[in-house]
Amino acid sequence: MTNIRKTHPLMKIVNNAFIDLPTPSNISSWWNFGSLLGICLILQILTGLFLAMHYTSDTTTAFSSVTHICRDVNYGWIIRYMHANGASMFFICLFMHVGRGLYYGSYTFLETWNIGVILLLTTMATAFMGYVLPWGQMSFWGATVITNLLSAIPYIGTNLVEWIWGGFSVDKATLTRFFAFHFILPFIIMALAMVHLLFLHETGSNNPTGIPSDTDKIPFHPYYTIKDILGAMLLILTLMLLVLFTPDLLGDPDNYTPANPLNTPPHIKPEWYFLFAYAILRSIPNKLGGVLALVLSILILALVPFLHTSKQRSMMFRPISQCLFWILVADLLTLTWIGGQPVEHPYIIIGQLASIMYFLIILVLMPVASTIENNLLKW
């Protein structure tokens, strides 16, 4: 009798994706982040569901409903902080996952990569709207500042902003619709993740060398299931250390003050995982220019496959590109730091230089370095 795992219509799909999947034998721990992102997503949906049972999306009661969750609901505090810090873990895994793709040339799987870029944008939108829901000072002013950026769009900008707000300012209508979108988007992310996986399994995984590994494949289970379980345990350990010891480490103290439209906080800034993009936005003195740079800072990822000039796929044997890659990582860390600083000297000029470097490395230096490395191969 054939194994039910291989014949049952539903179990067959699971089997081909997680059990009998032929996987390169040499993929490193950098390949763990895909499964970790799946775990993060499930964790966020579950904690979010329980939070939604007690949350009210009304401007008068939103803040106190979050307080009620933390004080009166059984284990409400841990659910709330797991959700808030789970978002941070989600973005850490996302950045690692994208970084891995850039380093090892995984972007040559065009469909998988493009859906990944869409996933990144959708996740950023979801996280932004989630940050608005507690209706603290930073929630309100963050929503006001970021949605206001759309007014930079010529001709339709103002109408667009008022349409998104559902009025002439961020108010009850805005909060209600943000809650609705924040609830539905994770399920869209889940569907997109399935398509992401579907396209990946059409080609099979990349590996650190960037060389086709069809001659050396091993089954996903038990080799990589056990490796993923180790990664998952480390992820959950890190998350619980954050939640139980320093739950507010990555948050903003201003968000413990209820939203007040009459009082602007001295420094409006988003969560840490948006600071690099926020720094790029602020580094351009022109409003429309800043918005374009902000959008391009993420969409530039979709251009990366077309800027690949190297004869090799991975950066494993390309020292100049490796050097540039780590400079890019340092540059992004610099931008993240600058995004959290006030707009004054010397932070302004550092932010501008780091923003120029970001686009310069990806658009100019990387392709040039690849061409130089191609020529060095002839020696």
Curated annotation (Swiss-Prot):
Sites where the protein binds heme b b566: 97, 196
CDD domains (UniProt xref): cytochrome_b_C (cd00290), Cytochrome_b_N (cd00284)
Q: How is the protein disposed in the membrane?
A: Multi-pass membrane protein
Could you say which cofactors this protein requires? heme b
Q: How is the cofactor bound?
A: Binds 2 heme b groups non-covalently.
Supply any other comment: Heme 1 (or BL or b562) is low-potential and absorbs at about 562 nm, and heme 2 (or BH or b566) is high-potential and absorbs at about 566 nm.
Localization (cell): Mitochondrion inner membrane
Q: Which UniProt keywords apply?
A: Electron transport, Heme, Iron, Membrane, Metal-binding, Mitochondrion, Mitochondrion inner membrane, Respiratory chain, Transmembrane, Transmembrane helix, Transport, Ubiquinone
PANTHER family linked: CYTOCHROME B (PTHR19271:SF16)
GO terms (molecular function) for this protein are: metal ion binding; ubiquinol-cytochrome-c reductase activity
Stretches assigned to coiled coil:
none
Q: What is its quaternary makeup?
A: The cytochrome bc1 complex contains 11 subunits: 3 respiratory subunits (MT-CYB, CYC1 and UQCRFS1), 2 core proteins (UQCRC1 and UQCRC2) and 6 low-molecular weight proteins (UQCRH/QCR6, UQCRB/QCR7, UQCRQ/QCR8, UQCR10/QCR9, UQCR11/QCR10 and a cleavage product of UQCRFS1). This cytochrome bc1 complex then forms a dimer.
Name it.
Answer: Cytochrome b
| Xref: InterPro entries | Cyt_b/b6_C (IPR005798), Cyt_b/b6_C_sf (IPR036150), Cyt_b/b6_N (IPR005797), Cytb/b6-like_sf (IPR027387), Cytochrome_b (IPR030689), Cytochrome_b_C_euk/bac (IPR048260), Cytochrome_b_N_euk/bac (IPR048259), Di-haem_cyt_TM (IPR016174)
Q: What's one Pfam family the UniProt record gives for this protein?
A: Cytochrome_B
Could you confirm whether the keyword rRNA-binding appears in this record? no
Family, according to the entry, reads as follows: Belongs to the cytochrome b family.
Q: Which residues bind a ubiquinone?
A: 201
Extract one GO cellular component term from the record. Answer: respiratory chain complex III
What the protein does comes down to:
Component of the ubiquinol-cytochrome c reductase complex (complex III or cytochrome b-c1 complex) that is part of the mitochondrial respiratory chain. The b-c1 complex mediates electron transfer from ubiquinol to cytochrome c. Contributes to the generation of a proton gradient across the mitochondrial membrane that is then used for ATP synthesis.
Q: Which residues cross the membrane?
A: 33-53, 77-98, 113-133, 178-198, 226-246, 288-308, 320-340, 347-367
Which one GO biological process term can you cite for this protein? mitochondrial electron transport, ubiquinol to cytochrome c
